[in-house]
């Protein structure tokens, strides 16, 4: 049957499929546009399943938040070209907004379907790999940061015995700076108490091997090893790291200083870091 060019264009605008595919779909469905759209989607889903084994090493991190709640998600695709595509980014923002508005805290079929529709049009394997929903309590303040390349995202929640200090600009700026710090230094742990004892023991043995040949008394060697362990922990633990905007103080000491100057205590309640392909 003859198919109008205007009908083909309308179907293409709706589905994103190629002109010839749209024409064939309309012919297959006897000119019924709704059936043709359904046919293309079903055909597209089959193609998506065939692409499911393809590696998705590119993608973006997306955050939707206010100062009491945040949704952060990771969405992956096959190529950097698609990761930077406006439609891909828009779908990520739409998924984050839906999860935020509906208080969703995990990947659901509803959220997956939003991405699946784009995957059928773009013809690339895509995945909604993880999603987290973080809430701040009445005595807490939430801040967040997304790096410009959209490959690193940070959510931080600070707590105070005087929550009114969170209305102060300097405290809000410090919370944001903590996010910047975490994105820049990518700590492996929040505090040194979180580090597995077996890992510390392993590092200790490595450092003992490094000082074994030194011509020094054993107690001096032990002191050197302890110093190396302390330095290593200060590099991998967020609260022990030298603060990015005042490296004379650790993050924890700077936090205490900012809180005291603002008129209350200040402590870390939660830290979440998403880096594309990794996480904390």
Curated annotation (Swiss-Prot):
Name under which the protein is recorded: Elongation factor Ts
GO molecular function: translation elongation factor activity
Keywords for this protein: Cytoplasm, Elongation factor, Protein biosynthesis
Superkingdom: Bacteria
Species of origin: Treponema denticola (strain ATCC 35405 / DSM 14222 / CIP 103919 / JCM 8153 / KCTC 15104)
Subcellular location, record wording: Cytoplasm
Lineage: Bacteria, Pseudomonadati, Spirochaetota, Spirochaetia, Spirochaetales
Region (Involved in Mg(2+) ion dislocation from EF-Tu): 79-82
One Pfam family matching this protein: EF_TS
Gene: tsf
Family: Belongs to the EF-Ts family.
């Amino acid at each position: 049957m003859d198919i109008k060019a205007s009908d083909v264009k309308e179907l293409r605008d709706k589905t994103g499929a190629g002109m010839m595919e749209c024409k064939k779909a309309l012919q297959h469905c006897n000119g019924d546009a709704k059936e043709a759209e359904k046919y293309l989607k079903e055909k597209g889903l089959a193609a998506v399943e065939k692409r499911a084994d393809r590696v998705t090493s590119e993608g973006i991190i997306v955050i939707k938040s206010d100062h009491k709640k945040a949704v952060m998600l990771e969405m992956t695709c096959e190529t950097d070209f698609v990761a930077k595509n406006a439609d891909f980014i828009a779908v990520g923002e739409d998924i984050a907004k839906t999860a935020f508005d509906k208080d969703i805290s995990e990947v659901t079929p509803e959220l997956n379907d939003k991405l699946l529709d784009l995957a059928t049009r773009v013809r690339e394997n895509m995945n909604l790999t993880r999603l987290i929903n973080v809430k701040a309590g009445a005595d807490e303040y939430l801040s967040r940061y997304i790096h410009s390349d959209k490959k690193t995202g940070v959510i931080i929640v600070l707590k105070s015995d005087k929550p009114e200090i969170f209305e102060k600009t300097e405290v809000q700026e410090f919370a944001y700076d903590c996010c910047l710090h975490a994105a820049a230094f990518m700590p492996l742990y929040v505090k040194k108490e979180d580090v597995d004892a077996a890992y510390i023991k392993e590092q200790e043995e490595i450092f003992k091997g490094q000082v074994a040949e030194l011509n020094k008394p054993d107690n001096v060697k032990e002191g050197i090893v302890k110093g190396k362990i302390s330095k290593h922990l200060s590099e991998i633990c967020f609260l022990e790291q030298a603060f990015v905007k005042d490296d004379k103080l650790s993050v924890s000491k700077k936090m205490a200083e900012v809180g005291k100057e603002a008129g209350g205590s200040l402590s870390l309640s939660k830290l979440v870091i998403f880096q594309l392909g990794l996480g904390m």
